[in-house]
């Protein structure tokens, strides 16, 4: 039985261990870059629960899935976009956990007043492409990068304008991993 819950500073070690358990290929898919253990530790140190929302999925023993929501700069307070980073432990995949984490992220982002949710991922990550399309996101692929843009205030297939905006996001892609390694949190 899995338990989804919001995470805070007390969960840093669980987050670190979860991300360290990811294989090099999994880390590349999660962060869109090759990441060593030091990078993971700096990334976790840079997480700020007062700024970011962290949703964790725990089994009986440890954190097996993580959604990280970060607010992106956008057109003002009424035009908030949330970027989501997602990771699921290898042995827990293909069980709907990614979908559950995304649904929880979507509900949390909507409750916080966000208008859109964006997910960047490697175009070779077919599971993420399928998941984001099932959520109703506009997905644009350009080379080895893909971006999914989800309008949080509408249901159904994405309109053409959202698809075009997703295309512009791919062109200006800057991953969520711009975390200051010296930041003290």
Label the predicted regions.
Residues 2-14:
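A short beta-loop-alpha structural element at the N-terminal edge
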Residues 21, 29-80, 89:
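Acetyl-CoA-dependent GNAT
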Residues 30, 118-119:
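Short catalytic-loop micro-motif centered on adjacent basic/acidic residues
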Residues 86, 121, 126-185:
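Terminal substrate-recognition subdomain of acyl/acetyltransferases
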């Amino acid at each position: 039985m899995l338990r989804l819950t919001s995470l805070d500073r007390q969960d840093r070690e669980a987050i670190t261990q979860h991300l360290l358990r990811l294989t090099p290929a999994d880390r590349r898919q999660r962060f869109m870059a090759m990441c060593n253990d030091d990078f993971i530790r700096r990334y976790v140190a840079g997480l700020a629960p007062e700024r970011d929302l962290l949703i964790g999925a725990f089994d009986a023993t440890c954190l097996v899935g993580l959604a990280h929501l970060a607010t992106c700069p956008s057109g003002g307070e009424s035009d908030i976009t949330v970027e989501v980073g997602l990771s699921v432990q290898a042995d827990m995949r293909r069980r709907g956990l990614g979908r559950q984490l995304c649904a929880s992220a979507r509900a949390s982002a909507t409750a916080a007043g966000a208008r859109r949710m964006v997910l960047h991922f490697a175009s070779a990550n077919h599971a993420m492409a399928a998941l984001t399309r099932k959520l109703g996101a506009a997905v644009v692929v350009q080379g080895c990068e893909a971006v999914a843009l989800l309008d949080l205030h509408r249901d159904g297939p994405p309109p053409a304008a959202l698809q075009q905006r997703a295309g512009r996001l791919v062109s200006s892609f800057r991953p969520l991993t711009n975390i200051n390694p010296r930041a003290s949190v």
